[in-house]
């Protein structure tokens, strides 16, 4: 039996560069940073006081205020991105949609950290009686999927993956396989995160993982630049509608791209420090799954976090996986503008990779003032200006604490 093909028919996102897909994409192509000083809480006693915050977001556009008050902000972002993607795909207008065959898999790397923080404070100040009865369901990671299935009546697979900063990529790759294996015809998949809080920022700052360039937030995230000093935390959600090809064609769906490969690996090395073998394996396995060669790759949306070790390591991994062809590929980090969305990163970056294929454009990697050639960061990072390019095959890399790696391969759709 021939393997079922999976295409992308809907996109939705909430991010520091915009609260809908078109706004975000336009801002990325313009090289506009979404990073600024933290306004969500008083960060004056933390050495990193900058973040990619979602601004001017109104969850009331998607659900009632009563419902919203019972959920953590990461669930808000996930629901919003999912409903955008569902609307973009035109699923609600499809009377013949078999909702038993539609599932949702939207994960988060951390989940309801602000709710946990606020509840802990309430207990300290007033005892256990102060715990909100919606605290648990309002902070569980799988509740994004739960709420979307309830809102839309979908009765297919419903779950939320947790794999640190690889969550979004794993969710999308796993969902594509569910469709290929026949467990669903449509999957709503991606990642969401909302951890800009004292614990979230303070925790990463304690690890010395964050940029401390507080005097110039817009240039703080600078992947592959000699002056990079850590990542900038971000928040938001990115969600794709994945659909079996014949199902999409039968209803005349708009097709952005095809997802043709997914690879996973483990570093088996260190809980936070990277090594090149693990990420290279993920890329190699994804290309093998896609039936493609390294020479077929045109574009890489890199993990590219702006850390001294991570950026150099990913460059080495790409050279290991792609060989000499690595020098002919556009390697781009949209984190230079969004910051690092943690568990949502793989979701928004998969979405941006799909748009790169669909629009034949690479966003820039901004803030490359002096490329760090001495550290081996010597590839084409699409520095500082967007570029029109032939992008038939794009890969999106996501790597997470614990040495968990995921690579997605998207291809220009050709029936």
Annotated model-derived regions:
Residues 126-132, 170-173, 177, 194-250, ...:
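Glycine-/small-residue-rich "gating" segment that lines the acyl/pantetheine channel
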Residues 85-98, 248-255, 283-299, 321-325:
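Phosphate/pyrophosphate-binding loops at sites that engage ATP/ADP/AMP, CoA/4′-phosphopantetheine
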Residues 78-89, 144, 171, 243-245, ...:
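Short, well-ordered amphipathic alpha-helical segments that serve as non-catalytic structural scaffolds
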Residues 10, 28, 82, 104, ...:
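Conserved small-residue
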Residues 5-9, 36, 215-290, 299, ...:
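Condensing-enzyme catalytic core mediating Claisen C-C bond formation in acyl metabolism
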Residues 39, 183-229, 262-274, 304-311, ...:
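Acyl-CoA/ACP chain-elongation machinery
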